[in-house]
Structure formats: structure tokens, C-alpha cells
């Protein structure tokens, strides 16, 4: 059986509860994907895959459905501990080629820091497969310009969720790319 996703939507959530597993469930609910049996997959953005809204994507899901997703996930039970989770995306200009999705789930990084890092990871993976020359020691903004000016990478972005731990509770953050037929 061959399954290449034709649609993708991006969602994120945060959950807090005294139990670790329950905080994850609440993060899934916040992201509106709790009714699915999620199967995490590695990080290829399929050729000709269309990005759709969360609302459109949710209409295509049924309770109990086996659903493939690239998921970044992080959790803490430490008070004031900053956690984040991000999925970065890099899409080639040629829609018959595949792109990349990357997961990043650090401690102590803001939405912006975490998101830029995840986006940089995805764009760098794509750039290396497309033969784009770049200096890995340059900062992300400079490399992003090089990638996009090459004409081979058309778009990159990220979806990121961060939160601080609350006293006595588990806090879980997730960011997901949900892949659909």
C-alpha cells in the first residue's frame, strides 16, 4: 500500500495537568487533534502537497482515525521552566520535488528562537539536497536570503508553541504538521 499525503495542516497546543499523560492529552485537545490515533513520521514534505487551514483539515478527520503527523513535543514539571516545540518547513520552488519538515523541542528558548531554529534546520536540509552552496556559520537571516535568492527554495516557515511550567503541574507543548490523503 502506498500513501503519499496530498494535504497538510499545522496546529499547536499547550496542556497543563498534575499527570504527565493528561497534560499531553490537554495539549492535543488545545491543538484540536485529540480524537485521532497519531502516528509520528519523519520529516519529508511531500511533492505537490497542499497546505490547508486547521478548520479544513479537521473536517477530514474522524474519531479513531490513524493519522500521520510530524510532531515536536516537550514537557516539564519544573516551575517557571520555559519549554518550546516547533515544526519548521522548507518547500522547494519545483513542486515535483520534496521539501523538509523539522522538529525542534528545546528548553529555555522563546517562540521566535525555537521557530527560527526549526525553520533553519528544514531549509538547510533542503538546501543541501538541492546543491545550494552556503556557509553554515552565517546566521539564519543571511542564509535564508541565499536560499531564497537561489530560486530553488520558494518558502520556509514554522509553527511554534512555548510555555512556562506552573507550580505542581506538568506542562506539555506540541507543534504538528498533520499529513492527510
Swiss-Prot record:
Cofactor requirement: pyruvate
UniProt site positions, description: Cleavage (non-hydrolytic): 42-43
Keyword list, A-Z: Decarboxylase, Lyase, Pyruvate
Pyruvic acid (Ser) PTM positions: 43
The reaction(s) this protein catalyses: L-arginine + H(+) = agmatine + CO2
Pfam families, per the entry: PvlArgDC
Broad enzyme group: lyase
Entry annotated with the keyword Lyase: yes
Gene3D superfamilies the UniProt entry points to: Pyruvoyl-Dependent Histidine Decarboxylase, subunit B
Keyword Lyase recorded: yes
Family as reported in the entry's similarity comment: Belongs to the PdaD family.
HAMAP family per UniProt: PvlArgDC
Protein name: Probable pyruvoyl-dependent arginine decarboxylase
Gene expressing this chain: pdaD
